[in-house]
């Protein structure tokens, strides 16, 4: 049995989702925050950087003259208070912690789906392309990734007046949509296969049965694949 193009396309879509999800996680452009003194900074899941306002000539603390093109960045982690600077610290800290956890779970689920696809190509008994469990395992992994990303993104439904969502957040939304699309393609393929198996068996009788007075007639028939 040859590998179905729909399954390969779904896995490719999930791979793009995995790339976008990691790109959104490791870029410091999840939100933009404006401080009272006019300084601006971009905050990501794992990094925060001060931005240089070229119009006003405002630079980040500790930046020397002539270094207007550099960013002063700091690493963020679980429960970082600096992510909520200028906003409600407790709320923003919870938002970023939730998104970090959901991002890691989604990454793991997408990687498991890719590994399942590769194992199926090796011809393992339980994960072969002929086994329906192979597609179901990939669909479950991609659907889990989509589900947890939705949970994480919903936490950013309400943000403070000094904060604006940036392109990394929208990049993660695209990753969520692609993971959903990959899971939907596999689920549709599974259901379509089941409908084919529920159809009645087709028996084609050989023309040799119409011959008269012939001994040893063979009842040749062809059944449906299911």
From Swiss-Prot:
The residues exposed to the Extracellular compartment are 27-103, 158-170
Please provide the record's keywords in A-Z order.
Cell junction, Cell membrane, Glycoprotein, Membrane, Transmembrane, Transmembrane helix
Where located?
Cell junction, Adherens junction; Cell membrane
**Which InterPro entries is this protein grouped with?**
TMEM204
Q: Which ranges does the record mark as transmembrane?
A: 6-26, 104-124, 137-157, 171-191
- Please give the superkingdom of this protein's source: Eukaryota
Record: glycosylation sites: 164
Its GO CC terms are: adherens junction; plasma membrane
Which GO biological process categories is it annotated with? lymph vessel development; regulation of vascular endothelial growth factor receptor signaling pathway; smooth muscle cell differentiation
Does Transferase count among this protein's keywords? Answer: no
Q: Which residues lie on this side of the membrane: Cytoplasmic?
A: 1-5, 125-136, 192-226
Tell whether Nucleus is among the UniProt keywords.
no
What topology does the record note for this protein and the membrane? Multi-pass membrane protein
Main function: Can influence paracellular permeability. Appears to be involved in cell-cell interactions through adherens.
Q: What is this protein called?
A: Transmembrane protein 204
Q: Which gene name belongs to this protein?
A: Tmem204
């Amino acid at each position: 049995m040859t590998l179905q193009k729909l399954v390969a396309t779904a896995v490719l879509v999930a791979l793009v989702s995995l790339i976008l999800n990691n790109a959104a996680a490791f870029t410091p452009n999840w939100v933009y925050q404006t401080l009272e003194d006019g300084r601006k900074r971009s905050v990501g899941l794992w990094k925060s950087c001060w931005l240089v306002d070229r119009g006003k000539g405002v630079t980040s603390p500790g930046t020397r003259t002539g270094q207007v093109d550099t960013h002063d960045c700091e690493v963020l982690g679980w429960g970082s208070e600096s992510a909520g600077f200028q906003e409600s610290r407790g709320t923003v800290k919870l938002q970023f912690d939730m998104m970090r956890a959901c991002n890691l779970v989604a990454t793991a689920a997408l990687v498991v789906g890719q590994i399942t696809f590769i194992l199926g190509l090796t011809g393992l008994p339980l994960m072969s392309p002929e086994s329906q469990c192979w597609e179901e395992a990939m669909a479950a992994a991609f659907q889990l990734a989509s589900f947890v990303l939705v949970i994480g993104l919903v936490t950013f439904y309400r943000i403070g007046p000094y904060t604006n969502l940036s392109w990394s957040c929208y990049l993660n939304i695209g990753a969520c949509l692609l993971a959903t699309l990959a899971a939907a393609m596999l689920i549709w393929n599974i259901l379509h296969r089941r409908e084919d198996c529920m159809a009645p068996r087709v028996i084609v009788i050989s023309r040799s049965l119409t011959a008269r007075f012939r001994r040893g007639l063979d009842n040749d028939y062809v059944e449906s694949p299911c």
